[in-house]
Amino acid sequence: MLNIKWIRENQELFDEKLSQRFIEPMSSKIAMLDGEKRKITCLIQEFQHARKVKSKILGNMASKSGEEFEGLQRDVKHINEKLEELEQDLNNNNELNELLNMLPNIPDEEVPYGMDESMNKLVRTYGETNPNALNKQHFELGTKLNLMDFEQTAKISGARFVTLKGDLAKLERALINFMIDVHTKEFDFFEISPPVLVRDNAMYNAGQLPKFAEESFATTNGYRLIPTAEVSLVNIVADTIIPREKLPMRYVAYTPCFRSEAGSSGRDTRGMIRLHQFGKVELVSITTTEESKNEHEYITNASETILQKLNLPYRVMLLCTGDMGFAAKKTYDIEVWLPGQKQYREIASCSNCGDFQARRMKARYKEFGSNETTLVHTLNASGLPIGRTMVAILENYQNEDGSITIPDVLINYMGGLQKITTYSE
């Protein structure tokens, strides 16, 4: 959520930042609604003060009867009725909060202006892409190996699900353990095993609700399946005040993730690129205002390191204003090279959300000996999605005979297996 005080004091700049997100000016409407809310709040405070004064006089009166006493009683009763009416008006005046809840984060000054991914800025590349490399797509390779099943799985769960078998299931498990080990041992992230069912308020805190309600799966009894472990991890600090010396707090978690993929009809309908259920290792950092920028580079480096150790070619893109996620103020996308598609595809997003999520979930920190609190900054990064990493391995490590060479760093995690070959039932 955006800072209403900042909007109030920077209306022209606020509208300019909204225009960079291709949103019409909102400052005038917000100022009007904010003014109405503040007026009601001021009246409530005045009536509360008047009630306190009159109640004190009533309590100190020697005679609990008579015209003066009864008149004061009537005054207090009238004040209570008026307060109830005003508080009801305040509770019903949801338009301001509803409007603020639908507005995305303000872009950082370093974010390039642009409407879509074509305007993203190349930051760096890693590894070499070979235009003459073997170029079968991952789903061709997986099904030929008899270790990736879409057809039978569709009978069980419908489209956008997959069943992995044998050595591919083992590769999935190896990747999870490898990624967690790198992040905990080399980057000092603390491993968490969080719930994947959360309440709506947790989704709201993370910026998933109300705007993206249709993109998540909801149960019939008030829970939602997480679209990313970011939701569970950032909420660890909801409604807390953290001692400054404990920051940064860095969390890593592997979870299954669930997305309805609303609006993705016709996109990536084959294979494992876009599934309703997928596994992902997620990174979250909680830090201070001053360290936020450096922490963004740190968490991005952690994600990149996984691809470097797997020797997968990739590039890092700085997203433009029109391509950034809702809660982000600045985002790097990491795109891995897929020979089967002959293009780079997104494999990770690394975002600095500033105090946007923290304001929603009331997460603060304070210096030792101080009573003043400051909103934390939250950052998140994919570290990485297991399915898309497996896609990249299958396509970049494929052999002429359809077998898949295991990347060196995964051989021990695969129990010494160096190559995945066709499974014969």
UniProtKB/Swiss-Prot annotation:
Main localisation, per the record?
cytoplasm
Q: Which is one Gene Ontology cellular component term of this protein?
A: cytoplasm
Q: Name one GO biological process term.
A: seryl-tRNA aminoacylation
Q: Which Gene3D superfamilies match?
A: Bira Bifunctional Protein, Domain 2, Serine-tRNA synthetase, tRNA binding domain
Q: List the disulfide bonds.
A: none
Q: Which reaction does it catalyse?
A: tRNA(Ser) + L-serine + ATP = L-seryl-tRNA(Ser) + AMP + diphosphate + H(+); tRNA(Sec) + L-serine + ATP = L-seryl-tRNA(Sec) + AMP + diphosphate + H(+)
Q: Which UniProt keywords apply?
A: Aminoacyl-tRNA synthetase, ATP-binding, Cytoplasm, Ligase, Nucleotide-binding, Protein biosynthesis
Determine if Protein biosynthesis is one of this entry's keywords: yes
Origin superkingdom:
Bacteria
UniProt-listed InterPro entries: aa-tRNA-synt_IIb, aa-tRNA-synth_II, aa-tRNA-synth_II/BPL/LPL, Ser-tRNA-ligase_type_1, Ser-tRNA-synth_1_N, SerRS_1_N_sf, SerRS_core, tRNA-bd_arm
Q: Which parts of the sequence bind ATP? A: 259-261, 346-349
Matching Pfam families = Seryl_tRNA_N, tRNA-synt_2b
Protein location: Cytoplasm
Query: A GO molecular-function term, please?
Result: ATP binding
Q: What is its EC number?
A: 6.1.1.11
| Pathway per the UniProt entry | Aminoacyl-tRNA biosynthesis; selenocysteinyl-tRNA(Sec) biosynthesis; L-seryl-tRNA(Sec) from L-serine and tRNA(Sec): step 1/1
Where, by residue number, does L-serine bind? Answer: 228-230, 282, 382
Summarizing the function annotation, the protein's role is: Catalyzes the attachment of serine to tRNA(Ser). Is also able to aminoacylate tRNA(Sec) with serine, to form the misacylated tRNA L-seryl-tRNA(Sec), which will be further converted into selenocysteinyl-tRNA(Sec).
- PANTHER family xref list: SERINE--TRNA LIGASE, SERYL-TRNA SYNTHETASE
The family this protein is said to belong to: Belongs to the class-II aminoacyl-tRNA synthetase family. Type-1 seryl-tRNA synthetase subfamily.
The protein's assembly and partners: Homodimer. The tRNA molecule binds across the dimer.
Query: Which HAMAP family did the record assign?
Result: Ser_tRNA_synth_type1
Q: What is known of its domains?
A: Consists of two distinct domains, a catalytic core and a N-terminal extension that is involved in tRNA binding.
Q: What protein am I looking at?
A: Serine--tRNA ligase
Q: What is the lineage of its organism?
A: Bacteria, Pseudomonadati, Pseudomonadota, Alphaproteobacteria, Rickettsiales
The record's gene field reads: serS
